[in-house]
Design a protein with these regions (language model features):
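Primarily the internal scaffold of c-type cytochrome electron-transfer domains
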Residues: 27-93, 99-104, 112, 124-129, ...
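Helix-start (N-cap) detector for alpha-helical repeat units in TPR-like alpha-solenoids
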Residues: 398-399, 432-433, 466-467, 500-501
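Register position in tetratricopeptide repeats
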Residues: 410, 444-445, 478-479, 508-511
Length: 511
């Protein structure tokens, strides 16, 4: 089961472009254009190709990033496997790193190559070193893309297919923090636009938390979608965020809000201290020393550091993140002294992040998401007990039904899983996991027509499901439809060069 990314943003249908805002707010607009948030996506133009060739030692695959007539591209090679892909868009400001996207008939996937700014080198993208071949089909979901691009253009009913272009405005637009701008542009009244600094603390902080608070797991509220949250809302009305009880885990790419909440400064200052206390959202970072001396003037005078030193050098050190190589981020926990990250025990409890729901339904879904991770299958019994109760309390909750069905199927109880999958799909036909899982049971029971119907539907939602495509080819093979079997195997080989299963089956079919 693929991890579900649960972030929520303004839908493109309500968008006014940032250029329209510039007509009245030129000075702010010009400053903002030079911030990292303004350049978190776009078309690659000035990439550093000085160290653009590398070999992945564990697999022996050699990668090279280069420019051709169409733009940026990369190739991979380990005889006899080789291939290349265009890289039409980048993701990430480049302040620490930059990832790239590949496209196949409008379906977007994260490329296995990335650029790391501090090291000034190209290497595999985060988590790609676990694969024995170039992995080209990690889906780029709207919930992920929306933290880097604006005015998205997703195709309804799919998970990762987009129109052309996939987003109308690169980077984080004005509306991402200020909400819909059409009424404000028409009236020029302050009441018709969101100013985060003037919101109540929980709504103000939600504007930043939508992208900078992941916790250990996020659980979507019933009926919520990636576009549910609007600036001015409480993020907690759309999702629940859970963290590990009593733990101070290492820094991750999106742990800024969580780490700040762990700091003595935040715990003492409360709502007075927030992201905007130190960060100018329209420009570069404010003077840290001035901010710190506002509370620490007396103690700072007795500090061993020199009078004009930057407080953050010691108290907000740059540290390696735990979920990406070659990347360092600022430690927002503001430690008095540098400390080693705590090791989170396998059985540590999940607790709601302050201000977010800890309802039994949300907790059940959170444990189910954790237990679906390959390294956390030992949490299945706990997740199962919570899901069973949640299923009784919420019999029409498609998310609960799907995760419950997944545990039953993965523990050898398909008869219990089938009605749950079917009910979930009746409630929400877009449920990809249910479509794939129910098709798997049909295949195991040699109900090939049912498996074919479900898996064709799954591939319409996400064309990059190579295992599903390979098994679909086998289902067609079983009913004697060799043309469709070959068609899907050819596509599987093209989408996953180096993956032995479809290549072997295709060779066998063509003998």
């Amino acid at each position: 089961m693929r991890p579900i990314l649960l972030l929520f943003f303004l839908s493109a249908a309500q968008a006014a472009t940032s250029d329209e805002c510039a007509a009245c707010h030129r000075e702010i607009y010009d400053r903002y254009r030079h911030t990292p948030m303004a350049v978190t996506s776009g078309v690659p133009a000035r990439e550093d190709l000085a160290r653009a060739t590398f070999t992945h030692a564990a697999t022996g695959f050699r990668y090279r990033v280069y420019r051709d007539r169409a733009g940026l591209a990369f190739e991979f090679r380990k005889d006899p496997v080789h291939g290349s892909r265009e890289l039409p868009w980048f993701i990430g400001s480049g302040a620490t790193a930059r990832s790239y996207l590949v496209a196949d008939d409008g379906y977007l996937f994260e490329a296995p190559v990335a650029y790391y700014s501090a090291a000034r080198k190209w290497d595999l993208a985060p988590a790609y070193d676990r694969y024995a071949y170039p992995f080209l089909t990690r889906p780029v979901l709207p919930a992920c893309l929306a933290c880097h691009a604006s005015a998205l253009n997703p195709v309804a009913g799919t998970h990762n297919q987009y129109g052309a272009p996939p987003f109308a405005e690169p980077g984080i637009s004005c509306e991402r923090c200020h909400g819909p701008g059409d009424r404000h542009i028409a009236s020029a009244k302050a009441a018709d636009i969101v100013n985060p600094a003037r919101l109540p603390a929980d709504r103000r902080d939600s504007v930043c938390a939508q992208c900078h608070l992941s916790g250990e797991v996020r659980a979507m509220h019933p009926g919520a979608r990636w576009s549910t949250y609007h600036p001015g809302d409480r993020l907690s009305d759309s999702i629940a965020v859970f963290v590990r009880a009593g733990a101070t885990p290492g820094i991750t790419v999106t742990s800024h809000v969580e780490k700040l909440a762990q700091s003595a400064c935040k715990q003492s200052a409360g709502d007075k201290l927030w992201c905007g206390s130190c960060h100018d959202p329209h420009g570069q970072r404010k003077s840290d020393r001035e901010m710190c001396l506002g509370c620490h003037g007396v103690t700072a005078a007795a500090c061993a550091a020199k009078q004009h030193d930057d407080c953050t050098r010691c108290h907000m050190p740059k540290s390696s993140v735990t979920d990406a190589q070659h990347v360092v981020y600022t430690d927002h926990s503001i430690p008095r002294r540098p400390r080693k990250p705590a090791v989170v025990a396998q059985g540590s409890d999940l607790v709601a992040f302050p201000g977010f729901s800890d309802s039994p339904r949300d907790l059940a879904l959170a444990w189910a998401i954790v237990a679906a991770r390959p390294e956390r299958t030992t949490d299945r019994p706990r997740a199962l007990a919570l899901l069973q109760q949640a299923g009784r309390d919420h019999p029409d909750d498609a998310e609960i039904l799907v995760y419950l069905a997944e545990i039953y199927r993965n523990t050898g109880k398909p008869d219990e899983a089938i009605p749950l999958y079917e009910r979930a799909l009746h409630l929400d036909p877009t449920q990809l996991t249910a479509t794939v899982g129910l098709g798997g049971i049909m295949m195991e029971r040699r109900q090939f027509a049912g498996a074919i119907r479900l898996w064709e539907d799954a591939l319409a939602k996400d064309a990059g499901l190579v295992l599903v495509r390979t098994n679909l080819a086998m289902a067609y093979w079983q009913i004697g439809d060799m043309a469709n079997a070959e068609r899907h195997l050819v596509k599987a080989v093209a989408m996953a060069p180096g993956f032995a299963a479809p290549a072997g089956l295709l060779a066998k079919l063509r003998r």
